Structures are given as C-alpha cells and as structure tokens.
Amino acid sequence: IVFYSVVTAFMVSHNIFNVYMIPYAMLPIIIRVFLDSRTAFLTHVITILICSISLRFPHEFILTQLAAGLVAIFSLRELSQRSQLFRTALLVILTYAAIYFAFELMTENGLANDFSKLNARMYTYFFINGILLLFTYPLLFLLEKTFGFTSNVTLVELSNINSDLLRQMSETVPGTFQHSMQVANL
C-alpha cells in the first residue's frame, strides 16, 4: 500500500507520465493468490482511496481502478495456469478502456458526434498498464521464494509427472510413486 501511495504522489507532484500507467491491479492479484478475495478487495480499496488523495480527478480514478481491481480479482479465482494471468491482464485493459470511454461520453465536450476528440494517449497508458501487470507472475515467484509462501501454481508445477524426479521415481519405485501422487491429489 505504501509503495503505491509513494509512487502515485511522486508521479503527480513531479508530473511524470500518468498514474494510469501504474498497475494498481497487481496488488489485489498478489493478495488473491496467497490469501482470499475479500482481503484482496479491501486492500485494493484502501490503496485506491489513499492514492486518490493526491489526484485532480479522484472520482474518475477511484471508479476506474475499482472496476479494474474487481475484474482482476474475479477473473482470477485460482491461479493454476500462466495463461490465466494473460487473460486477466487483457480483461483489465478492456475494463480500463470501457470505463474511460464511458467517462469521455459523459463529459461536457462528449464524443457524441466527433470521435477525433478521443484521447488516444490514455489507451496507450492502459496498454502499458496491462504489460506491467504481466510482471505479476515473476513477482509471485520472487515472493514465494523470499518468504516461503506456496501458491497453487507451485503445487501444479510440483505435481507435474514429466519432471525428472517423478519420472525416475515412477520407473524405479512405482508403488511409492502411485502413493505419492494419491497423497498429493488430496
């Protein structure tokens, strides 16, 4: 929470890039993988509310980030395959784009007749945000190794019967291998 608050305040005070480039949905994904959805949602809401203090348009930021965080949490029920993170990043990008487009339609100088007023740079920021969101997977690995956590992805990788150790075990001691696989599936 502190990291996102400091980065947001720094970017706003020094007018560096745009805060929509920061992957705020990374925090609820990490917390969702190791803990649960409620904790991830509460942490995300607290982070977004704290970060919105330093912004010019906090209501737009809060609604956009809240929607993206909810999509990230609920599209990632259990991280058991790497492809799920790609799908989540794509859904977050689409959520950002849809919410921002809706805000653009609601403004006074709306896009009712002229889509050339659309700020294409914002959609680039959303895409960069999605790319940065893909760095969640290596960060999860780093957190697992650093703090000794175990995620579902690690358990799936450990139960891969094509690994050298399990293949050797199935050839030399098939009974122990079968028993180990049954216990692992429990």
Which positions does each model-derived feature cover?
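Generic detector of multi-pass transmembrane helix bundles and their immediately adjacent loops
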Residues: V2-F177, M181
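An active-site-proximal "capping" alpha-helix that borders the catalytic cofactor pocket
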Residues: Q182-L186
